[in-house]
Curated annotation (Swiss-Prot):
Record organism: Bacillus cereus (strain G9842)
Sequence similarity: Belongs to the thymidine kinase family.
Protein's UniProt name: Thymidine kinase
Binding-site residues for Zn(2+), renumbered to this chain: C145, C148, C183, C186
Residue sites binding ATP per the record: G15, S16, M17, F18, S19, G20, K21, S22, D88, E89, V90, Q91
Catalyzed chemical reaction(s): thymidine + ATP = dTMP + ADP + H(+)
PROSITE patterns for this protein: TK_CELLULAR_TYPE
Keyword Nucleotide-binding: yes
Pfam family, one: TK
GO MF, one example: thymidine kinase activity
Length: 195
């Protein structure tokens, strides 16, 4: 990584579920706090699995967060004394999130976003691909495939223990009872006629 001499840039943390995205976001935020920098964390209101007002990793690490309904609501909470803006579960935000992140970085903030880069079908998820394209730094994390133990880059949605069909709804917030990390070879997405 290169030394950045100017303020304002974008970092994307992405990967499958259970790859440590929220944990990495929390780690980066805590490091900034140790350095006496002011950070604020946002999350979409839809993410209420573990807490309404915290970003919580699957292993229980947490940091206070401001839940917002729309991307542009983030601006209402930004003050000039802040250094770092962190956004978890970025794939759940509306299409304005790309512009919001660009504006914040252009204003001199370090912007850290974390989210799924692929949906349960293995296709690009929401605005994450665009954010990856404009980011100065991209960290792609992998989990361990729950079926074979290989590196997992995909998220398997399970309904009653069976892989969800391709045309099932994209957004369904859940935890380990609904999703598993899978490698390319163990990931399965049948069509409804295959079920």
């Amino acid at each position: 990584m290169y030394l950045i001499n100017q303020n304002g840039w974008i970092e994307v943390i992405c990967g499958s579920m259970f790859s440590g995205k929220s944990e990495e976001l929390i780690r980066r935020v805590r490091r900034t706090q140790f350095a006496k920098q002011h950070a604020i964390v946002f999350k979409p209101c839809i993410d209420n699995r573990y807490s309404e007002e915290d970003v919580v990793s699957h292993n229980g690490l947490k940091v206070k967060a401001v839940p917002v309904s729309a991307s542009k609501d983030i601006f209402e909470h930004i003050t000039e004394d802040m250094d770092v803006i962190a956004i978890d579960e970025v794939q759940f935000f509306d299409g304005d999130i790309v512009e919001v992140v660009q504006v914040l970085a252009n204003r001199g903030y370090r912007v850290i976003v974390a989210g799924l880069d692929q949906d349960f079908r293995g296709l690009p998820f929401g605005q994450v691909p665009q954010l990856m394209a404009i980011a100065e730094h991209v960290t792609k994390l992998q989990a361990v495939c729950s079926a074979c133990g290989s590196p997992a880059s995909r998220t398997q949605r399970l309904i009653d223990g069976e892989p969800a069909a391709f045309d099932d709804p994209i957004i369904l917030v859940g935890a380990s009872e609904s999703y598993e990390p899978r490698c390319r070879h163990c990931h399965a997405v049948p069509t409804n006629k295959d079920k």
